[in-house]
């Protein structure tokens, strides 16, 4: 069985053992080379004591356990680790007498392998037993939920709750204790999320059962079908959440899974990065196939956003930019076909494509901001209108028709909000973690909405049923909480300056029309509608401004933005009051002037908020420099001294490996992971940037580790070097962690800081696991067990890829965080210069 350490307890026990085993492997190699001079007895005795203590604890657990599977699984693991300790003791004795003893060397390696594998198996047996206990608690709660479907009187509801509470409490307790133990942060977050769902649904379940009881008691009442739907919906939600808890409890993978989603979902951050990489490549004259393919993907994204644009004008701009860029690419391909890919004309077209690609990216940001400004201006309006329709007087002749219309509008509104959130998640340039959270929130909103209309219909059919009204209110509040939470997340991703500009233009247009209506003494209801629209949009400006203020740790900016927002907030109510006064006295010129003046103050307030944000704005990408006209490209300056020539021979070899064409990934996945990080870092100048230097060191060492993993230096040397290189990479990872934390602590942008810190949280666990897995791999090399060696390799490959992927993300997140560093911070001197470029920075998304 592969070595597992998916909990912190397992990792804390296996790590020191792995260090001792690693030392034993080094002694084995010394023995193979005839260089062993040390007596192994003290080290072997230390390992033996650890084995004895662990076996004693395990034996006592077997005696007291009622888990028959545990009793059957544990003894073989105990025997394996005890036998391994005997092998080590024999090896120490044999090698002390004769350092060339073949039997001693064999037993040393077999014992080292047996100790780490046996301990892992033993600990896993105990962990599986604990998980089975947790699953049993969860299953008991899950099974008891079915009782809720047959409750028809409130007395039975009381009994149900009395019986459910102990099991539910136990389940929550064991899950709360488990999730902090997991080394896989994604799994820990899943458990927390599903436990939150359970907590959220319990009061809704109680309310839904109570509605069913009262509808059943009331003879001849209608709405039973909808009431039962609401109850069963909540039961199903709870069942699914508990099933997911059970699934995650049984997972033992230690690596982060790739996010899976719809179009663009799996690489929201990669998409933004692709835009920037393609711009830089085109600006430097690179029109290779990979560059043009990346540009075409960007064009496809622009057209996808265009199809979902809020207005025809925005759609037309996006499509025009995409079409123009597509035409430039066709011209470039024609030049390449004629062998003129390096001509002045091709360079001019490449530069034009870079500029047009930047325009397309900007139009996408504008389109997203415009759609959010359109769809989120009145989030709670439709559900409140639906509630009012359900509560309408039974004597209202249009009651049923009005309810049907409001229900239809609510469902369309929910779909629109969720669609917009998903669009922002896939195209907003946010981190993949933020994109995944947005998609979850959108799915949650859609899910909750399925219970809203049935709950409202029960109220419609049972006007006097207070329990039905309470249930509708509960469901409505849950929907509003979900929608508002999703709205805040969306506001945190979109380009807030573009949002302010869109909102300001719309408010100006509405105010202009409202003033015209007031002065022309036209339909008063039109005036109220325009004034209400202005008020809602102004309040949205305040909401987005608050998100920006909450995100910043710059006290001066926060103070200015808060002051401007407060002034705007104070101007909204007077404008609405004056609009109502105009309706009351439509011919009063003085009142008309007061309304116009108050409306202008709202416009001024919005402009002031926009101005504060604009003054503090860091553009995502500054304009590309103008292409200098020249007949022939200038001669390249003499190359600087190659940094690789200053490296030790081993690192020079790694540098050459990383710069050489890559073999197929399936032939050498660790090398591929190292090369990916190296090329990400190699875009940046190392001068003045210790983080980039450190990352390139890690990539070189990972490339060498891939060589040692494959045994390319000879079996004896590879084992020692594999363990040594893993330890060095782990030390580099700790240095990277320290340096990047300095950047995070100095960053005044909370979103950028949080994104970076979340990535850094992964590094300690991954780097510790790397040392353990390298040791496991070393013990399996040449051991004669092909299956064990393959398992060890797979685990090491997965860890290496995970570490390199995290390091690559840390580079991007650190560069983004450096855009808003405190000027007085020591780390503020860090420089981010693109090689051969203008030092353009990739801004964090707002």
Swiss-Prot record:
This is Vinculin. Residues 315-370 form a coiled coil. The keyword Ion transport does not apply. It is found in: Cytoplasm, Cell cortex; Cell projection, Filopodium; Cytoplasm, Cytoskeleton. One of its GO terms (molecular function) is actin filament binding. InterPro entries: Alpha-catenin/vinculin-like_sf, Vinculin, Vinculin/catenin. Disulfide bonds: none annotated. Keywords: Actin-binding, Cell projection, Coiled coil, Cytoplasm, Cytoskeleton. Expressed in epithelial tissues, specifically the pinacoderm (outer epithelium) and choanoderm (feeding epithelium) (at protein level). Also detected in migratory cells of the mesohyl (at protein level). The keyword Coiled coil applies. Monomer. Interacts with TLN (talin); the interaction facilitates VIN1 binding to F-actin. Its main location: cytoplasm. One of its GO terms (biological process) is cell adhesion. Gene3D superfamilies: Alpha-catenin/vinculin-like, Vinculin, Vh2 four-helix bundle. It comes from the Eukaryota. Actin filament (F-actin)-binding protein which may play a role in cell-cell adhesion. SUPFAM superfamilies: alpha-catenin/vinculin-like. Residues 1-257 are annotated as: Interaction with TLN. Belongs to the vinculin/alpha-catenin family. Residues 617-646 are annotated as: Disordered. GO terms for cellular component: cortical cytoskeleton; filopodium.
